[in-house]
Amino acid sequence: MIHVRRHETRRNSKSHVPEQKSRVDWRRTKRSSISQLLDSDEELDSEEFDSDEELDSDESFENDEELDSNKGPDCNKTPGSERELNLSKIQSEGNDSKCLINSGNGSTYEEETNKIKHRNIDLQDQEKHLSQEDNDLNKQTGQIIEDDQEKHLSQEDNDLNKQTGQIIEDDLEEEDIKRGKRKRLSSVMCDSDESDDSDILVRKVGVKRPRRVVEDEGSSVEMEQKTPEKTLAAQKREKLQKLKELSKQRSRQRRSSGRDFEDSEKESCPSSDEVDEEEEEDNYESDEDGDDYIIDDFVVQDEEGDEENKNQQGEKLTTSQLKLVKQNSLYSFSDHYTHFERVVKALLINALDESFLGTLYDGTRQKSYAKDMLTSLHYLDNRFVQPRLESLVSRSRWKEQYKERVENYSNVSIHLKNPENCSCQACGLHRYCKYSVHLSGELYNTRTMQIDNFMSHDKQVFTVGRICASRTRIYHKLKHFKFKLYQECCTIAMTEEVEDEQVKETVERIFRRSKENGWIKEKYGQLEEYLNFADYFQEEKFEL
């Protein structure tokens, strides 16, 4: 261990207090005789001035030592404290001088007092001057500090403004790039032209969008010039496509103008369409540069082509609807009498050829007349008769067993009988029954009209009320109307049949004769009467 000897200072040893030098003794030794002071005032003044300087230098030296030794709050002393020390020194000097004057002569005392007064006045003036200088220095230092602070603050504000300006500019640039609208293109291009460093402006867009590069103003102008050219070319192509479709439709109309609809559909072949397409392509190549397009010897303007295209689309819809109607036998635009005539003709053919209706329903026959007959048969069953039957049953309380009996027996007879106060066998309600219903006849197929001879002689008798009896009569007539009509057609065909004559000729002859003598109209009127009875049938009422 190395021991270091520390020098004693004021801070280290508090017990040992060094004796301060007496400034009064020093002045006494300086001023050995009062007579020297009386010789010349100038010498005294000069000596006094020197003494003051020495005092100031000594005191400043001691103050520096105290500042170095303390390193504490004494280092923050101000010029005001120094002025207080000077005043205390001057007062001590005045006291010393008074003592010296008292020890001298009386004459010298007065002179000395005058000099001291002058000296005090000079000292006061010096103090005022020093205080003014200190105030000026403080003001100057305060102004300098304020100026420095203002400069520092202004520099910080400028830096902040620059940084914020740069951030705002960056944000604006990013916003311009993200929007990517054509309206913002001019502003972005101006910024790129003003900057000396960047000649090419690259837009940043999303991941899925392609990157757009704008090089010059001239390139944007070229793009704007190209876009209308592209739109014009696209419009021309669309017009040509519309005109091609229109020419195809017109050519088809010309081919099918003198023919039937179905025959024209069968005879139209794709080869003619391909030839038309080749001719139209040649016309397209020859007339590609023109404003108007001439195809198939006719000129079509823009608006006229659109209107005709709409008309052709409407015609297409109507033809497709007709096709659907012919495919679906439930829908037809023919009148009721036309359907009835077709039904009569189909029944006449089946009377001569019993397999005709079977092949018609199973789809074996695909000719147009066969499809028309099938449509009319469906129309009679499903549009004329079946809705009325359903309404009659729905408004009654018929038992299911009674309804099946009425449907399966082709013959019915209703008779009056002695009234009985009993329950009706049709609806099950307690009635005053005075009618008896007799059901008989063969069972048959409602489509092919083939008779089933099983239990052909069976009969059923039911006791019913007045309402159920009249309802049974209408229901049975509508349900078995087609079978009764078929039986009459069979009897006519048996009487009018001629040997060595084809079925088609026989049917045409019988049908023409039946139409001439009014038999078909008579049967159609009978059907309408039954339908009207079913429509206006009254509700069931309880009899008292």
UniProtKB/Swiss-Prot annotation:
Sections of the chain in a coiled coil: 229-256
Acidic residues: bias regions: 39-67, 273-294
InterPro entries: CCDC82 (IPR025244), DUF4211 (IPR025451)
Disordered as annotated region, ranges: 1-294
Flavoprotein recorded as keyword: no
Residue positions, PTM Phosphoserine: 88, 131, 154, 195, 219, 329
Polar residues: compositionally biased ranges: 88-108
Keyword Cell inner membrane: no
Record's compositionally biased regions (Basic residues): 1-14
Basic and acidic residues composition bias: residue spans: 16-27, 112-132, 223-248
Modified residues (Phosphothreonine): 227
Pfam families the record matches: DUF4196, DUF4211
Keywords: Coiled coil, Phosphoprotein
Gene Ontology cellular component annotations, sorted alphabetically: nucleus
Protein name as catalogued: Coiled-coil domain-containing protein 82
Organism: Homo sapiens (Human)
